UniProtKB/Swiss-Prot annotation:
Residues 682-712, 725-955 are annotated as: Disordered. One of its GO terms (cellular component) is spindle microtubule. ATP binds at G122, Q123, T124, G125, S126, G127, K128, T129. This is Kinesin-like protein K39. Residues 426-955 form a coiled coil. It holds the Pfam family Kinesin. The keyword Repeat applies. GO terms for molecular function: ATP binding; microtubule binding; plus-end-directed microtubule motor activity. Keywords: ATP-binding, Coiled coil, Cytoplasm, Cytoskeleton, Microtubule, Motor protein, Nucleotide-binding, Repeat. Sequence repeats lie at residues 704-742, 743-781, 782-820, 821-859, 860-898, 899-937, 938-955.
Amino acid sequence: MHPSTVRREAERVKVSVRVRPLNERENNAPEGTKVTVAAKQAAAVVTVKVLGGSNNSGAAESMGTARRVAQDFQFDHVFWSVETPDACGATPATQADVFRTIGYPLVQHAFDGFNSCLFAYGQTGSGKTYTMMGADVSALSGEGNGVTPRICLEIFARKASVEAQGHSRWIVELGYVEVYNERVSDLLGKRKKGVKGGGEEVYVDVREHPSRGVFLEGQRLVEVGSLDDVVRLIEIGNGVRHTASTKMNDRSSRSHAIIMLLLREERTMTTKSGETIRTAGKSSRMNLVDLAGSERVAQSQVEGQQFKEATHINLSLTTLGRVIDVLADMATKGAKAQYSVAPFRDSKLTFILKDSLGGNSKTFMIATVSPSALNYEETLSTLRYASRARDIVNVAQVNEDPRARRIRELEEQMEDMRQAMAGGDPAYVSELKKKLALLESEAQKRAADLQALEREREHNQVQERLLRATEAEKSELESRAAALQEEMTATRRQADKMQALNLRLKEEQARKERELLKEMAKKDAALSKVRRRKDAEIASEREKLESTVAQLEREQREREVALDALQTHQRKLQEALESSERTAAERDQLLQQLTELQSERTQLSQVVTDRERLTRDLQRIQYEYGETELARDVALCAAQEMEARYHAAVFHLQTLLELATEWEDALRERALAERDEAAAAELDAAASTSQNARESACERLTSLEQQLRESEERAAELASQLEATAAAKSSAEQDRENTRATLEQQLRESEARAAELASQLEATAAAKMSAEQDRENTRATLEQQLRDSEERAAELASQLESTTAAKMSAEQDRESTRATLEQQLRDSEERAAELASQLESTTAAKMSAEQDRESTRATLEQQLRESEERAAELASQLESTTAAKMSAEQDRESTRATLEQQLRDSEERAAELASQLEATAAAKSSAEQDRENTRAALEQQLRDSEERAAELASQ
């Protein structure tokens, strides 16, 4: 009996279509409620109705023909999940119906050893994820569970049932990956930070092996023992899977997700000695694919990153469509097909699904569509691709090791023989027992050999992993040594930088010290300069104040002397009026003199007016052109010259008064000599008139003195103003020359007038006789004038008192000025103290800067020492690393020698096993031949027995 060949089954891809209910967006749209799809679940036919009208703004003109003709599509199964019954009146399909039709066969194929695949294809928002995962993956039971949790639940139930028989056990492993932007990410991989967006993606590479097929290198597979484990892992993967909200779907999948279930059988056999032998049995792989939905950018209105995601999704789905077209064309046309190789490698998705499409797999496809007219084009495109996929033919084979398959066949034969021995002929049973013992020994031997080979393979894999780990450790040590070398170099560079920085800090400190010393010298010089300037200003102000006080005292004394002279002269006039008489001519002369004095007073008033005008002109010039030191000097000179001219005019007036006094004395003597009462009366009148003139002159003198003080005050104000222009100087000089000329002209006129008065006084004697007639009238007038003179004397006394008060006020001003100057002196001293304190603080800052520099120097020296210590540590670590590297190389060489020896032993063992297998095959052939001979003999004996029994029965 020869071993059976590998079991292979060729069948096409099973395609199902599921029509979902209308969603909220479609119910709210004007044409959303128009259903364009009809289905007959019993006949598995989907009909796309004619789309009438032209109101659908989203329709493409290229689909016009398709809209006018209804199209029927035949599939393997149709699930109508719309609320209303289908065209045949069947009730809507549930999640349980989908599982019974698709999921249950997948579980059966998995335990039979066939690879299988289920992938959902359709537009975004058409119900793919709901069909595959359900409304809530965390819910372990309920009507809303999807195909995936139901498949896992059925796998664990079947696993428990098989393991209960005691011949084998099944191991289930789960993997979960996604294809996002043409990169494959392991959703169960160990992430450093653990959350999407905050942690790193764990990418894996897609590889292809001649015997294993397509696999993911570096993928993490987790063994699961219950549905709770599956749900937990799926929730972990969904937590890091890429999803987003679009106009078409609130939770749109932005990647293709693949759940991989790996089933491995482990068979057990007990020998006669009681030893348990474990061997590998069947294995299978199940891929549950939730494809991202195809979408039109105009409808989903995505942009930015979502636009990039939609582009990659549509490209991968387009590649999937091309693969389906090529495989379908190859299946239907054979050698006449246009393409002989499908473009699997154009996309990561199609590369992963290579075995599922046209390879070693039993594949199911479920296409999900929307019945709404809003999705007419997408629905029609999905149905066309699904219909095209039905033409793809896969050739699936059982995944089982030939030796394990042979052991399984021997076990099946032994089980058949055990059943044949029940109630049979003893001799036949004895023969069968012998053959059964031979088969059992052969099976046990093969199982032991297989177990030994598996252990040896596992040992070799362990050694290979150890070798790879050693190589990885070596490379890691080399990288660490290089990193340590770089770190030491960086430390040296840092030490050099710190040393250079220290030098720069020292230079900067020295530079700052020099700048600080220069700044301190500048401040000292500025302080000395300010102190000298303040001292000079104080001395100057003190001199000005003393000169002003002295001038005021001098003027006061002059005023007192003038007042005493006037009073003395008044008494003399009074005595002359009482003791003598004046003649009419003398009276006229005195009157004429009085008139001249009044005119002279008018002229003096004009002089004062001119001086005031000059002062105003000077003020205007100062306002227009500014003030300078030169203008102050000019103004002071002008004021001094005006004051000199004023004193000259006063002196001239006093001279005239003295002349008048002399004339009065001469008249009085003449009057005394003549003893003329009338003349005496006239003389009294003349004296009174003269007294009035003197009083007027005194008043004018006082006014002039007041104006002089005002002029002096103004001159002092002008002296305090420091800016003027050359034009002001020239104008002031010109005005001064004009004033000088005017005053000189007035002085000459006054001298001429004085000469006239002298001549008039000489003519007074001649007019004495003519004045006697008016003496009586004049006496009354003189008496009145005398009373006025007395009143004027009282006014002069009050003016004297006011002058005294002004003097006191001037003294107070002097005192206040002195206090102000003293305050300024104190302020200057305080400023000097502040500058001294600033100097002290600057010195303290300098000391602090020196301390900081010393501390910085100590810190840098400490860091330098630490860097040197670190460099020494790094050098020691480098030496130890080098020693460890050499030790690792020695270990690697010894491990390599050991592995090579083990490999040679394995090869020798394999040769022995091969020879044993050949001997076993020869013995097996001999045993089979003996068994055939025995069977033929037994059959002959059985026929003989039957003939004998027939004969006995006939007898």
